[in-house]
Amino acid sequence: MEPVQSAAPQITLTQVSVEPEEGTGNWKILWRVANLNSQPLDLHAVRLPHGQFKSAERRFEPAIVLAAKQDAQFQVFVHCDEPAGLVTENAFLIFQVVRLGEPWRIFARVRVTVKMSGTPVATTELITMQQVGFSGVPD
């Protein structure tokens, strides 16, 4: 059994590939997410709310079920129409997940660098998590 302090879901997140989509500044980005815990993790949704690296919420139906120590890939359509060389700090992927029957939010902070070709490249800098309802405010 894991200690109480490690009850939070733990993941890694990596950008795998990026392809241009129809329309200026639209990209199809493939991500790899890995469950670092010894229990399953269900991914229900992800969104990217930053204005310079943005997508609508993507609901996973059915949920992406990651067994212990397993990884999976998913795609998100992102709008990023920034000039070459621009670095966007504090962009986020915000996941809605369930672990051991409890809802959590996982915040993956990424740094996005726009290459000379205009292609956005995201590097994960920090991943934090927050249990839904911890503050007494319902979801």
How should each PLM-predicted stretch be described?
Residues Q15-G25, V65-A67, E82-L86:
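Short, solvent-exposed beta-strand/turn "edge" segments of beta-rich domains on protein surfaces
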Residues A56-A84:
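Intrinsically disordered, low-complexity Pro/Gly/Ser/Thr-rich segments with frequent PxxP/GP/PP motifs
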Residues E2-A7, E19-G25, R109-D139:
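Acidic, serine/threonine- and proline-rich intrinsically disordered appendage/tail regions
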Residues D81-L126:
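Terminal connector regions
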